[in-house]
From Swiss-Prot:
It is found in: Secreted. Belongs to the conotoxin D superfamily. The cysteine framework is XXVIII (C-C-C-CC-C-C-C-C-C). It comes from Conus litteratus (Lettered cone). Residues 22-40 form a propeptide. Keywords: Disulfide bond, Neurotoxin, Secreted, Signal, Toxin. Probable neurotoxin. This is Conotoxin Lt28.5. Its main location: secreted.
Length: 85
């Protein structure tokens, strides 16, 4: 087998071995991207967002759509924020 054919064969087989060794790519999670996008738009000043991200899905206190974790009430089936003053 000539060198060129051997090189082409190696180049075709090598990526298959690499893909098998690494495994398939992780599944794409649209929900995580939506939450991340919402956080970037509305909650710049708060660092730990995940515990209360569902607490205030619409603009409430300060027009940011966020309320602090300390005032977020998650005792019932859903989390709620206090009314704005």
């Amino acid at each position: 087998m000539p060198k060129l054919e051997m090189m082409l064969l190696v180049l075709l087989i090598l990526p298959l071995c690499y893909i098998d060794a690494v495994g398939p790519p992780p599944p794409w999670n649209m929900e995580d991207e939506i939450i991340e996008h919402w956080q970037k738009l509305h909650c710049h000043e708060i660092s730990d967002l995940t515990p209360w991200i569902l607490c205030s899905p619409e603009p409430l206190c300060g027009g940011k759509g966020c309320c602090a974790q300390g005032v977020c009430d998650c005792s019932g089936p859903a989390c709620t924020c206090p009314p704005c003053l």
